[in-house]
Amino acid sequence: MAKKILYQDNARRALERGMEIMVEAVSVTLGPKGRNVVLEKTYGSPQIVNDGVTIAKEISLEDHIENTGVSLIRQAAAKTNDVAGDGTTTATVLAYAMVKEGLKNVAAGANPISIKLGMEKATQYLVMQINEFAQPVEDIQSIKQVASISAGNDDVIGALIADALAKVGKEGVISLEEGKGIVTELEITEGMKLEKGFISPYFITDTEKMEVCFENPYILLTDKRITLVQQDLLPILEQITKTKRPLLIIAEDVEKEALATLILNKLRGIVNVVAIRAPGFGELRKLMLQDIAVLTGGTVITQDAGLSLDNIQVNLLGQARRIIVNKDTTTIVGDGLEIENIKARCEQLRKQVNIAETSYEKEKLQDRIAKLSGGIAVIRVGAVTETEMKDKKLRLEDAINATRAAVEEGIVPGGGATLAHLSENLVTWSKTNLKEDELIGALIISRAIVAPLKRIAENAGINGPVVIGKVQEQEFEIGYNAAKNLFGNMYDEGVVDPAKVTRSGLQNATSIASMILTTECIIVDDIEKVK
Protein backbone atom coordinates (compact mmCIF):
# COMPACT_ATOMS: atom_id res chain seq x y z
CA MET A 1 0.00 0.00 0.00
CA ALA A 2 1.19 3.54 -0.81
CA LYS A 3 2.43 5.55 2.16
CA LYS A 4 1.98 9.19 3.10
CA ILE A 5 4.97 10.85 4.79
CA LEU A 6 4.96 14.07 6.81
CA TYR A 7 8.03 15.79 8.25
CA GLN A 8 8.90 18.08 11.18
CA ASP A 9 6.34 20.75 12.06
CA ASN A 10 3.69 19.36 9.67
CA ALA A 11 3.99 15.95 11.34
CA ARG A 12 3.74 17.32 14.88
CA ARG A 13 0.82 19.65 14.03
CA ALA A 14 -1.15 16.75 12.48
CA LEU A 15 -0.70 14.73 15.68
CA GLU A 16 -1.77 17.75 17.74
CA ARG A 17 -5.02 18.11 15.76
CA GLY A 18 -5.97 14.51 16.56
CA MET A 19 -5.08 14.98 20.21
CA GLU A 20 -7.20 18.14 20.42
CA ILE A 21 -10.32 16.35 19.14
CA MET A 22 -9.81 13.55 21.65
CA VAL A 23 -9.02 15.81 24.64
CA GLU A 24 -12.05 18.02 24.01
CA ALA A 25 -14.33 14.96 24.13
CA VAL A 26 -12.71 13.58 27.29
CA SER A 27 -12.15 16.80 29.27
CA VAL A 28 -15.85 17.79 29.34
CA THR A 29 -16.21 15.11 32.06
CA LEU A 30 -13.56 16.62 34.38
CA GLY A 31 -14.51 17.88 37.83
CA PRO A 32 -17.72 17.81 39.90
CA LYS A 33 -19.59 19.85 37.28
CA GLY A 34 -18.26 17.88 34.31
CA ARG A 35 -20.84 16.68 31.77
CA ASN A 36 -21.56 13.21 30.39
CA VAL A 37 -20.68 11.77 26.98
CA VAL A 38 -23.05 9.53 24.98
CA LEU A 39 -21.45 6.62 23.11
CA GLU A 40 -23.28 4.95 20.24
CA LYS A 41 -23.14 1.15 20.42
CA THR A 42 -23.39 -1.18 17.42
CA TYR A 43 -25.65 -3.46 19.47
CA GLY A 44 -27.99 -2.41 22.26
CA SER A 45 -28.80 1.00 23.68
CA PRO A 46 -26.34 3.94 23.67
CA GLN A 47 -24.04 4.20 26.70
CA ILE A 48 -23.85 7.37 28.81
CA VAL A 49 -20.45 7.66 30.51
CA ASN A 50 -18.38 9.99 32.63
CA ASP A 51 -15.18 7.93 32.51
CA GLY A 52 -12.14 9.22 30.59
CA VAL A 53 -10.58 5.93 29.54
CA THR A 54 -13.91 4.49 28.27
CA ILE A 55 -14.45 7.56 26.06
CA ALA A 56 -10.83 7.44 24.87
CA LYS A 57 -11.23 3.82 23.73
CA GLU A 58 -14.24 4.73 21.58
CA ILE A 59 -12.61 7.54 19.55
CA SER A 60 -11.36 6.66 16.07
CA LEU A 61 -10.86 9.33 13.39
CA GLU A 62 -11.08 9.10 9.61
CA ASP A 63 -7.76 10.92 9.05
CA HIS A 64 -4.99 8.35 9.66
CA ILE A 65 -2.43 10.88 10.92
CA GLU A 66 -4.84 12.56 13.33
CA ASN A 67 -5.89 9.09 14.49
CA THR A 68 -2.23 8.36 15.32
CA GLY A 69 -2.35 11.38 17.66
CA VAL A 70 -5.48 9.95 19.28
CA SER A 71 -3.78 6.55 19.76
CA LEU A 72 -0.72 8.14 21.37
CA ILE A 73 -2.66 10.18 23.92
CA ARG A 74 -4.93 7.20 24.57
CA GLN A 75 -1.81 5.40 25.83
CA ALA A 76 -1.37 8.02 28.57
CA ALA A 77 -4.94 7.35 29.73
CA ALA A 78 -4.67 3.56 29.45
CA LYS A 79 -1.33 3.35 31.29
CA THR A 80 -2.62 5.57 34.11
CA ASN A 81 -5.71 3.34 34.32
CA ASP A 82 -3.50 0.22 34.55
CA VAL A 83 -1.27 1.67 37.28
CA ALA A 84 -3.72 3.64 39.42
CA GLY A 85 -7.17 2.72 38.03
CA ASP A 86 -8.32 6.36 37.96
CA GLY A 87 -7.14 9.82 36.86
CA THR A 88 -7.36 9.03 33.15
CA THR A 89 -9.03 12.33 32.20
CA THR A 90 -6.39 14.29 34.13
CA ALA A 91 -3.58 12.39 32.35
CA THR A 92 -5.14 13.16 28.95
CA VAL A 93 -5.57 16.87 29.72
CA LEU A 94 -1.99 17.09 31.03
CA ALA A 95 -0.47 15.33 28.00
CA TYR A 96 -2.25 17.65 25.56
CA ALA A 97 -1.30 20.78 27.54
CA MET A 98 2.37 19.68 27.48
CA VAL A 99 2.29 19.02 23.72
CA LYS A 100 0.59 22.35 23.01
CA GLU A 101 3.14 24.32 25.09
CA GLY A 102 6.05 22.28 23.74
CA LEU A 103 5.15 22.71 20.05
CA LYS A 104 5.33 26.50 20.39
CA ASN A 105 8.92 26.23 21.65
CA VAL A 106 10.01 23.61 19.10
CA ALA A 107 8.59 25.78 16.29
CA ALA A 108 10.56 28.73 17.70
CA GLY A 109 13.81 26.75 17.30
CA ALA A 110 14.35 25.03 20.68
CA ASN A 111 16.06 21.62 20.63
CA PRO A 112 13.41 18.86 21.14
CA ILE A 113 15.87 16.43 22.78
CA SER A 114 17.00 19.01 25.37
CA ILE A 115 13.34 19.94 25.97
CA LYS A 116 12.57 16.23 26.57
CA LEU A 117 15.40 15.98 29.13
CA GLY A 118 14.18 19.11 30.90
CA MET A 119 10.62 17.75 31.01
CA GLU A 120 11.80 14.44 32.48
CA LYS A 121 13.92 16.16 35.17
CA ALA A 122 10.99 18.44 36.06
CA THR A 123 8.68 15.43 36.38
CA GLN A 124 11.14 13.62 38.68
CA TYR A 125 11.24 16.72 40.91
CA LEU A 126 7.41 16.94 40.95
CA VAL A 127 7.04 13.24 41.84
CA MET A 128 9.37 13.75 44.83
CA GLN A 129 7.31 16.78 45.88
CA ILE A 130 4.00 14.88 45.56
CA ASN A 131 5.36 12.04 47.73
CA GLU A 132 6.62 14.59 50.27
CA PHE A 133 3.28 16.41 50.57
CA ALA A 134 1.13 13.23 50.58
CA GLN A 135 -0.71 12.53 53.84
CA PRO A 136 -1.26 8.90 54.85
CA VAL A 137 -4.82 7.56 54.84
CA GLU A 138 -5.66 5.94 58.14
CA ASP A 139 -9.26 6.71 59.02
CA ILE A 140 -12.51 5.66 57.38
CA GLN A 141 -13.51 9.31 56.81
CA SER A 142 -10.52 9.91 54.47
CA ILE A 143 -11.31 6.73 52.53
CA LYS A 144 -14.93 7.86 52.17
CA GLN A 145 -13.81 11.27 50.83
CA VAL A 146 -11.51 9.73 48.20
CA ALA A 147 -14.17 7.25 47.03
CA SER A 148 -16.89 9.96 46.88
CA ILE A 149 -14.75 12.32 44.76
CA SER A 150 -13.74 9.56 42.35
CA ALA A 151 -17.35 8.41 41.95
CA GLY A 152 -18.35 11.91 40.82
CA ASN A 153 -19.15 13.44 44.23
CA ASP A 154 -21.46 10.59 45.22
CA ASP A 155 -21.44 10.33 49.04
CA VAL A 156 -23.54 7.14 49.03
CA ILE A 157 -20.96 5.28 46.92
CA GLY A 158 -18.18 6.74 49.08
CA ALA A 159 -19.76 5.43 52.29
CA LEU A 160 -20.41 2.03 50.68
CA ILE A 161 -16.77 1.54 49.60
CA ALA A 162 -15.41 2.80 52.94
CA ASP A 163 -17.69 0.28 54.66
CA ALA A 164 -16.54 -2.51 52.32
CA LEU A 165 -12.84 -1.78 52.95
CA ALA A 166 -13.43 -1.60 56.71
CA LYS A 167 -14.93 -5.10 56.62
CA VAL A 168 -12.51 -6.92 54.29
CA GLY A 169 -9.33 -4.93 55.05
CA LYS A 170 -6.93 -3.08 52.78
CA GLU A 171 -5.89 -6.25 50.95
CA GLY A 172 -9.45 -7.57 50.69
CA VAL A 173 -11.30 -8.10 47.43
CA ILE A 174 -14.25 -5.94 46.38
CA SER A 175 -16.37 -7.44 43.62
CA LEU A 176 -19.14 -5.72 41.61
CA GLU A 177 -22.35 -7.49 40.59
CA GLU A 178 -25.48 -6.28 38.84
CA GLY A 179 -28.24 -6.06 41.45
CA LYS A 180 -31.86 -7.05 40.96
CA GLY A 181 -33.45 -3.86 42.32
CA ILE A 182 -32.71 -0.13 42.23
CA VAL A 183 -30.81 0.03 45.54
CA THR A 184 -27.04 -0.51 45.65
CA GLU A 185 -26.21 -2.94 48.49
CA LEU A 186 -23.13 -4.37 50.18
CA GLU A 187 -22.74 -8.01 51.18
CA ILE A 188 -19.74 -9.77 52.73
CA THR A 189 -19.22 -13.36 51.60
CA GLU A 190 -16.45 -15.95 51.72
CA GLY A 191 -14.08 -15.91 48.81
CA MET A 192 -10.48 -15.87 47.71
CA LYS A 193 -8.19 -14.06 45.29
CA LEU A 194 -5.46 -16.10 43.58
CA GLU A 195 -2.43 -14.50 41.93
CA LYS A 196 -2.88 -16.55 38.75
CA GLY A 197 -4.73 -15.56 35.57
CA PHE A 198 -6.11 -17.49 32.58
CA ILE A 199 -3.70 -19.67 30.57
CA SER A 200 -5.08 -18.41 27.25
CA PRO A 201 -6.90 -15.19 26.27
CA TYR A 202 -9.27 -17.29 24.11
CA PHE A 203 -11.23 -18.03 27.30
CA ILE A 204 -12.27 -14.35 27.68
CA THR A 205 -16.04 -13.76 27.90
CA ASP A 206 -16.03 -9.96 28.44
CA THR A 207 -13.88 -8.41 25.69
CA GLU A 208 -14.36 -4.87 27.04
CA LYS A 209 -12.76 -5.68 30.41
CA MET A 210 -10.62 -8.54 29.03
CA GLU A 211 -11.78 -10.99 31.67
CA VAL A 212 -13.72 -14.23 32.16
CA CYS A 213 -16.82 -13.96 34.31
CA PHE A 214 -18.87 -17.08 35.20
CA GLU A 215 -21.96 -17.34 37.42
CA ASN A 216 -22.50 -20.53 39.45
CA PRO A 217 -19.54 -22.51 38.02
CA TYR A 218 -18.14 -25.94 38.88
CA ILE A 219 -14.46 -25.98 39.91
CA LEU A 220 -12.08 -28.83 39.07
CA LEU A 221 -9.01 -28.96 41.36
CA THR A 222 -5.99 -31.13 40.55
CA ASP A 223 -2.26 -31.06 41.28
CA LYS A 224 -1.34 -32.87 38.07
CA ARG A 225 -0.69 -31.72 34.51
CA ILE A 226 -3.60 -32.22 32.13
CA THR A 227 -2.02 -33.75 29.03
CA LEU A 228 -4.22 -36.47 27.55
CA VAL A 229 -7.50 -35.36 26.01
CA GLN A 230 -9.23 -38.77 26.03
CA GLN A 231 -8.35 -39.80 29.62
CA ASP A 232 -7.98 -36.47 31.43
CA LEU A 233 -10.50 -34.14 29.84
CA LEU A 234 -13.31 -35.83 27.95
CA PRO A 235 -14.93 -37.70 30.91
CA ILE A 236 -15.47 -34.53 32.95
CA LEU A 237 -16.33 -32.29 29.95
CA GLU A 238 -19.12 -34.69 28.92
CA GLN A 239 -20.62 -34.55 32.43
CA ILE A 240 -20.33 -30.75 32.66
CA THR A 241 -22.00 -30.29 29.24
CA LYS A 242 -25.10 -32.10 30.55
CA THR A 243 -25.37 -29.70 33.52
CA LYS A 244 -25.07 -26.61 31.22
CA ARG A 245 -22.94 -24.89 33.90
CA PRO A 246 -19.52 -23.30 33.36
CA LEU A 247 -16.26 -24.89 34.55
CA LEU A 248 -13.08 -23.49 36.12
CA ILE A 249 -10.07 -25.82 35.92
CA ILE A 250 -7.22 -25.24 38.40
CA ALA A 251 -4.34 -27.58 37.52
CA GLU A 252 -0.53 -27.64 37.62
CA ASP A 253 -0.63 -26.95 33.88
CA VAL A 254 -2.65 -27.71 30.75
CA GLU A 255 -0.59 -29.07 27.84
CA LYS A 256 -1.03 -27.85 24.25
CA GLU A 257 -3.37 -30.53 22.92
CA ALA A 258 -5.62 -30.42 25.99
CA LEU A 259 -5.64 -26.60 25.95
CA ALA A 260 -6.63 -26.61 22.26
CA THR A 261 -9.53 -28.97 23.07
CA LEU A 262 -10.78 -26.68 25.85
CA ILE A 263 -10.56 -23.58 23.65
CA LEU A 264 -12.35 -25.33 20.78
CA ASN A 265 -15.21 -26.41 23.07
CA LYS A 266 -15.43 -22.86 24.44
CA LEU A 267 -15.46 -21.19 21.00
CA ARG A 268 -18.07 -23.61 19.65
CA GLY A 269 -20.30 -22.90 22.64
CA ILE A 270 -20.34 -26.53 23.79
CA VAL A 271 -19.08 -25.76 27.30
CA ASN A 272 -18.07 -22.51 28.99
CA VAL A 273 -14.65 -23.22 30.45
CA VAL A 274 -11.51 -21.44 31.70
CA ALA A 275 -8.22 -22.94 32.89
CA ILE A 276 -5.66 -21.44 35.28
CA ARG A 277 -2.41 -22.75 36.73
CA ALA A 278 -2.53 -23.68 40.42
CA PRO A 279 -0.91 -21.09 42.71
CA GLY A 280 2.27 -21.85 44.67
CA PHE A 281 5.01 -24.44 44.12
CA GLY A 282 5.78 -27.96 45.31
CA GLU A 283 4.20 -28.90 48.64
CA LEU A 284 2.72 -25.40 49.09
CA ARG A 285 0.71 -25.85 45.87
CA LYS A 286 -1.02 -28.96 47.25
CA LEU A 287 -1.84 -27.15 50.50
CA MET A 288 -3.26 -24.13 48.66
CA LEU A 289 -5.40 -26.42 46.50
CA GLN A 290 -6.74 -27.98 49.73
CA ASP A 291 -7.64 -24.45 50.95
CA ILE A 292 -9.54 -23.76 47.71
CA ALA A 293 -11.28 -27.14 48.09
CA VAL A 294 -12.47 -26.15 51.59
CA LEU A 295 -13.78 -22.81 50.26
CA THR A 296 -15.63 -24.39 47.32
CA GLY A 297 -16.72 -27.68 48.90
CA GLY A 298 -14.76 -29.72 46.37
CA THR A 299 -12.08 -32.42 46.45
CA VAL A 300 -8.52 -32.12 45.11
CA ILE A 301 -7.93 -34.84 42.50
CA THR A 302 -4.51 -36.24 43.45
CA GLN A 303 -2.83 -39.61 43.11
CA ASP A 304 -2.04 -39.48 46.85
CA ALA A 305 -5.80 -39.72 47.50
CA GLY A 306 -6.16 -42.49 44.91
CA LEU A 307 -8.19 -40.27 42.56
CA SER A 308 -7.67 -39.80 38.83
CA LEU A 309 -9.27 -37.60 36.18
CA ASP A 310 -10.54 -40.49 34.00
CA ASN A 311 -13.16 -41.67 36.53
CA ILE A 312 -14.08 -38.38 38.20
CA GLN A 313 -17.69 -37.60 39.16
CA VAL A 314 -19.41 -34.18 39.33
CA ASN A 315 -19.90 -34.52 43.11
CA LEU A 316 -16.10 -34.22 43.57
CA LEU A 317 -16.06 -30.76 41.96
CA GLY A 318 -16.16 -27.54 43.93
CA GLN A 319 -18.79 -24.85 43.37
CA ALA A 320 -18.85 -21.06 43.65
CA ARG A 321 -21.38 -18.27 43.27
CA ARG A 322 -19.18 -16.42 40.82
CA ILE A 323 -15.62 -16.31 39.43
CA ILE A 324 -13.76 -13.47 37.72
CA VAL A 325 -10.50 -14.31 35.90
CA ASN A 326 -8.21 -11.78 34.19
CA LYS A 327 -4.66 -12.13 32.85
CA ASP A 328 -3.10 -11.82 36.34
CA THR A 329 -5.64 -12.85 38.99
CA THR A 330 -8.59 -15.13 39.73
CA THR A 331 -11.32 -14.14 42.20
CA ILE A 332 -13.58 -16.86 43.58
CA VAL A 333 -16.76 -15.65 45.31
CA GLY A 334 -18.08 -18.38 47.63
CA ASP A 335 -21.69 -19.57 47.72
CA GLY A 336 -22.01 -19.20 51.52
CA LEU A 337 -22.46 -22.93 52.20
CA GLU A 338 -18.98 -23.70 53.57
CA ILE A 339 -18.71 -21.20 56.48
CA GLU A 340 -18.21 -23.87 59.19
CA ASN A 341 -15.59 -25.77 57.16
CA ILE A 342 -13.68 -22.52 56.48
CA LYS A 343 -13.69 -21.64 60.20
CA ALA A 344 -12.42 -25.12 61.10
CA ARG A 345 -9.68 -24.94 58.44
CA CYS A 346 -8.54 -21.49 59.69
CA GLU A 347 -8.44 -22.80 63.27
CA GLN A 348 -6.31 -25.73 62.13
CA LEU A 349 -3.90 -23.37 60.32
CA ARG A 350 -3.64 -21.08 63.38
CA LYS A 351 -2.52 -24.09 65.46
CA GLN A 352 0.13 -24.83 62.83
CA VAL A 353 1.36 -21.21 63.07
CA ASN A 354 2.02 -21.71 66.80
CA ILE A 355 4.20 -24.78 66.21
CA ALA A 356 5.90 -23.56 62.99
CA GLU A 357 9.68 -23.54 63.35
CA THR A 358 10.81 -21.00 60.74
CA SER A 359 9.60 -17.46 60.06
CA TYR A 360 9.06 -18.47 56.39
CA GLU A 361 6.63 -21.22 57.43
CA LYS A 362 4.78 -18.83 59.74
CA GLU A 363 4.53 -16.19 57.02
CA LYS A 364 3.11 -18.67 54.48
CA LEU A 365 0.59 -20.03 56.99
CA GLN A 366 -0.57 -16.52 57.94
CA ASP A 367 -0.88 -15.68 54.26
CA ARG A 368 -3.13 -18.72 53.75
CA ILE A 369 -5.27 -17.80 56.79
CA ALA A 370 -5.68 -14.26 55.43
CA LYS A 371 -6.72 -15.58 52.01
CA LEU A 372 -9.28 -17.97 53.50
CA SER A 373 -10.77 -15.75 56.19
CA GLY A 374 -10.47 -12.34 54.51
CA GLY A 375 -13.70 -12.72 52.60
CA ILE A 376 -14.94 -10.72 49.65
CA ALA A 377 -17.12 -7.63 49.68
CA VAL A 378 -19.78 -7.92 46.98
CA ILE A 379 -21.40 -4.65 45.95
CA ARG A 380 -24.70 -5.26 44.16
CA VAL A 381 -25.19 -2.27 41.87
CA GLY A 382 -28.80 -1.12 41.67
CA ALA A 383 -30.18 1.13 38.91
CA VAL A 384 -33.43 1.98 37.15
CA THR A 385 -32.17 1.41 33.59
CA GLU A 386 -29.38 -0.61 31.96
CA THR A 387 -27.68 2.61 30.81
CA GLU A 388 -27.59 3.94 34.39
CA MET A 389 -26.30 0.55 35.58
CA LYS A 390 -23.28 0.68 33.24
CA ASP A 391 -22.46 4.26 34.26
CA LYS A 392 -22.76 3.39 37.96
CA LYS A 393 -20.50 0.35 37.59
CA LEU A 394 -17.80 2.44 35.87
CA ARG A 395 -17.98 5.06 38.64
CA LEU A 396 -17.77 2.37 41.31
CA GLU A 397 -14.74 0.76 39.63
CA ASP A 398 -12.98 4.14 39.53
CA ALA A 399 -13.85 4.78 43.17
CA ILE A 400 -12.55 1.37 44.32
CA ASN A 401 -9.28 1.83 42.38
CA ALA A 402 -8.81 5.39 43.68
CA THR A 403 -9.40 4.24 47.25
CA ARG A 404 -6.80 1.47 46.97
CA ALA A 405 -4.33 3.97 45.45
CA ALA A 406 -4.96 6.37 48.35
CA VAL A 407 -4.31 3.67 50.93
CA GLU A 408 -1.03 2.78 49.14
CA GLU A 409 0.61 6.20 48.71
CA GLY A 410 -1.54 8.67 50.67
CA ILE A 411 -3.65 11.67 49.60
CA VAL A 412 -2.98 15.22 48.38
CA PRO A 413 -5.30 18.24 47.92
CA GLY A 414 -7.66 17.49 44.99
CA GLY A 415 -9.38 19.52 42.31
CA GLY A 416 -6.10 20.22 40.47
CA ALA A 417 -4.82 22.25 43.46
CA THR A 418 -1.71 20.12 44.13
CA LEU A 419 -0.29 20.55 40.62
CA ALA A 420 -1.23 24.26 40.53
CA HIS A 421 0.74 24.89 43.74
CA LEU A 422 3.69 22.74 42.62
CA SER A 423 3.84 24.72 39.36
CA GLU A 424 5.34 27.68 41.25
CA ASN A 425 7.78 25.47 43.19
CA LEU A 426 8.92 23.96 39.88
CA VAL A 427 9.65 27.37 38.32
CA THR A 428 11.92 28.28 41.27
CA TRP A 429 13.67 24.88 41.26
CA SER A 430 14.24 24.75 37.49
CA LYS A 431 15.70 28.27 37.30
CA THR A 432 18.25 27.22 39.92
CA ASN A 433 19.07 23.75 38.56
CA LEU A 434 18.56 23.85 34.77
CA LYS A 435 19.65 26.04 31.90
CA GLU A 436 19.02 26.73 28.18
CA ASP A 437 16.61 24.33 26.43
CA GLU A 438 16.36 22.01 29.46
CA LEU A 439 15.03 24.97 31.43
CA ILE A 440 12.48 25.57 28.64
CA GLY A 441 11.38 21.90 29.00
CA ALA A 442 10.83 22.32 32.75
CA LEU A 443 8.92 25.57 32.24
CA ILE A 444 6.69 23.81 29.68
CA ILE A 445 5.72 21.36 32.45
CA SER A 446 5.15 24.21 34.94
CA ARG A 447 2.71 25.91 32.54
CA ALA A 448 0.99 22.66 31.53
CA ILE A 449 0.25 21.27 35.00
CA VAL A 450 -2.26 24.03 35.81
CA ALA A 451 -4.45 22.73 32.92
CA PRO A 452 -6.58 20.32 35.06
CA LEU A 453 -7.54 23.12 37.51
CA LYS A 454 -8.29 25.46 34.59
CA ARG A 455 -10.56 22.86 32.98
CA ILE A 456 -12.35 22.00 36.26
CA ALA A 457 -13.12 25.72 36.74
CA GLU A 458 -14.27 26.16 33.12
CA ASN A 459 -16.57 23.12 33.38
CA ALA A 460 -18.11 24.84 36.42
CA GLY A 461 -18.64 28.02 34.33
CA ILE A 462 -15.87 30.02 36.08
CA ASN A 463 -12.88 31.84 34.53
CA GLY A 464 -9.96 29.35 34.68
CA PRO A 465 -6.93 31.72 34.80
CA VAL A 466 -8.58 33.78 37.59
CA VAL A 467 -9.10 30.63 39.70
CA ILE A 468 -5.48 29.51 39.09
CA GLY A 469 -4.19 32.93 40.21
CA LYS A 470 -6.24 32.87 43.42
CA VAL A 471 -5.21 29.29 44.29
CA GLN A 472 -1.50 29.98 43.74
CA GLU A 473 -1.61 32.96 46.14
CA GLN A 474 -2.70 30.65 49.00
CA GLU A 475 -1.10 27.93 51.15
CA PHE A 476 -0.56 24.41 49.71
CA GLU A 477 -3.76 22.96 51.29
CA ILE A 478 -5.98 25.69 49.81
CA GLY A 479 -7.76 24.97 46.53
CA TYR A 480 -10.95 25.59 44.57
CA ASN A 481 -14.01 23.48 45.42
CA ALA A 482 -15.95 23.60 42.14
CA ALA A 483 -18.95 21.75 43.60
CA LYS A 484 -19.59 24.58 46.10
CA ASN A 485 -17.87 27.36 44.09
CA LEU A 486 -15.60 28.42 46.96
CA PHE A 487 -11.93 28.44 47.98
CA GLY A 488 -10.91 26.55 51.11
CA ASN A 489 -8.75 23.89 52.77
CA MET A 490 -9.15 20.88 50.48
CA TYR A 491 -8.62 18.36 53.30
CA ASP A 492 -11.41 19.99 55.35
CA GLU A 493 -13.66 20.22 52.28
CA GLY A 494 -13.09 16.52 51.57
CA VAL A 495 -11.73 17.26 48.07
CA VAL A 496 -8.70 14.98 47.96
CA ASP A 497 -6.89 12.90 45.31
CA PRO A 498 -4.76 9.78 45.79
CA ALA A 499 -1.08 10.77 45.43
CA LYS A 500 -0.57 7.67 43.24
CA VAL A 501 -3.20 8.87 40.73
CA THR A 502 -1.68 12.38 40.50
CA ARG A 503 1.84 10.94 40.21
CA SER A 504 1.14 8.29 37.56
CA GLY A 505 -1.01 10.69 35.49
CA LEU A 506 1.83 13.21 35.44
CA GLN A 507 4.51 10.61 34.59
CA ASN A 508 2.49 9.05 31.74
CA ALA A 509 1.53 12.45 30.31
CA THR A 510 5.19 13.55 30.28
CA SER A 511 6.24 10.28 28.65
CA ILE A 512 3.76 10.62 25.75
CA ALA A 513 4.25 14.39 25.32
CA SER A 514 8.05 14.15 25.17
CA MET A 515 7.78 11.37 22.54
CA ILE A 516 5.51 13.53 20.37
CA LEU A 517 7.76 16.59 20.70
CA THR A 518 10.77 14.56 19.49
CA THR A 519 8.86 13.22 16.45
CA GLU A 520 10.36 14.39 13.13
CA CYS A 521 8.50 12.17 10.68
CA ILE A 522 5.20 10.26 10.40
CA ILE A 523 4.54 7.45 7.93
CA VAL A 524 0.92 6.29 7.46
CA ASP A 525 -1.11 4.49 4.78
CA ASP A 526 -2.26 6.85 2.03
CA ILE A 527 -5.97 6.02 1.80
CA GLU A 528 -6.62 8.61 -0.94
CA LYS A 529 -4.22 6.85 -3.33
CA VAL A 530 -6.05 3.58 -2.79
CA LYS A 531 -9.40 5.20 -3.63
Swiss-Prot record:
What catalytic activity is recorded?
ATP + H2O + a folded polypeptide = ADP + phosphate + an unfolded polypeptide
Q: Give the enzyme's main class according to its UniProt record, as a single word.
A: isomerase
Q: How is this protein organized at the quaternary level?
A: Forms a cylinder of 14 subunits composed of two heptameric rings stacked back-to-back. Interacts with the co-chaperonin GroES.
- Predominant subcellular localization, coarse grouping: plastid
> What InterPro entries would the database entry show?
Chaperonin_Cpn60_CS, Cpn60/GroEL, Cpn60/GroEL/TCP-1, GroEL-like_apical_dom_sf, GROEL-like_equatorial_sf, TCP-1-like_intermed_sf
Annotated GO molecular function terms are:
ATP binding; ATP-dependent protein folding chaperone; isomerase activity; unfolded protein binding
Alphabetized PROSITE patterns for the sequence: CHAPERONINS_CPN60
Entry coiled-coil feature ranges: none
Q: What GO CC annotations are associated with the protein?
A: chloroplast
Short name of any one Pfam family annotated for the protein: Cpn60_TCP1
Look up the EC number in the record and give it.
5.6.1.7
Q: Which gene encodes it?
A: groEL
Return the protein name.
Chaperonin GroEL, chloroplastic
Q: What does this protein do?
A: Together with its co-chaperonin GroES, plays an essential role in assisting protein folding. The GroEL-GroES system forms a nano-cage that allows encapsulation of the non-native substrate proteins and provides a physical environment optimized to promote and accelerate protein folding.
Which keywords fit this entry according to its UniProt record? Answer: ATP-binding, Chaperone, Chloroplast, Isomerase, Nucleotide-binding, Plastid
Q: Which GO terms describe its biological process?
A: protein folding; protein refolding
Residues noted as binding ATP in the record, renumbered to the chain: T29, L30, G31, P32, D86, G87, T88, T89, T90, G415, N481, A482, A483, D497
Q: Where in the cell is it found?
A: Plastid, Chloroplast
